[in-house]
């Protein structure tokens, strides 16, 4: 699955054995995220990004990951649509993601830039891959706590209204065009190299009325 995913610019971001409470069947759930560098250049040339229909990234993810699941005789699940799937809980259980000091999810490879495009349930209970270290344990400066220019996102709280108010102003242009400064501040994600165009795409969906 990892090799097949790499061919479509996805990579394994974690894996876990399912529990009865998951109610998705028994087996190994493999979480998939964007493979960098090159993910955005790849998906932005797909039919979903040129047909003018809404939600191109979700539609690309659904098409591509469903094919991967079929090829592996597995089942695809997604962090969008219904029923809602607990991707954050699954990520935490994988041992490769944790809650950061600002309470956003942090990943051992992608840092605060972590995102999941989907998951594939394999029917066998496979040996799980090694997990990475919790990046925040060795992060002394913790720049994420002070990176937000208006203090909307701190270890104490996330003031969503203050965040949106800032993004409405001219000063918020850098966040809208390059992505959240808190996410960018995380040293764990500096080698992940997500391009600004992808961050801008997500910001436009987070804050569509500017």
Predicted segments, located by residue:
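Non-ligating segments of multi-cofactor redox enzymes
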Residues: 1-210
């Amino acid at each position: 699955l990892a090799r097949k995913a790499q061919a479509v610019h996805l990579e394994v971001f974690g894996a876990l054995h399912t529990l009865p409470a998951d109610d998705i069947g028994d087996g190994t759930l493999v979480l998939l995220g964007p493979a960098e560098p090159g993910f955005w250049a790849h998906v932005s040339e797909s039919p979903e990004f040129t047909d003018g229909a809404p939600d191109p990234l979700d539609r690309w993810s659904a098409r591509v990951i469903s094919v991967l699941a079929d090829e592996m005789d597995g089942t695809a699940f997604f962090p969008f649509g219904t029923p809602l799937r607990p991707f954050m809980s699954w990520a935490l259980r994988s041992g490769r993601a944790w809650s950061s000091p600002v309470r956003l999810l942090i990943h051992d490879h992608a840092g605060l830039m972590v995102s999941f495009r989907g998951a594939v349930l394999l029917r066998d209970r496979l040996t799980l891959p090694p997990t990475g270290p919790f990046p925040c344990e060795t992060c002394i400066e913790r720049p994420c706590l002070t990176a937000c220019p208006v203090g909307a996102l701190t270890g104490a709280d996330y003031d969503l209204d203050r965040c949106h108010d800032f993004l409405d102003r001219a000063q918020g242009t850098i966040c809208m065009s390059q992505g959240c400064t808190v996410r960018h501040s995380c040293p764990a994600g500096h080698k992940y190299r997500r391009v600004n165009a992808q961050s801008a795409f997500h910001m436009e969906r987070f804050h569509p009325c500017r």
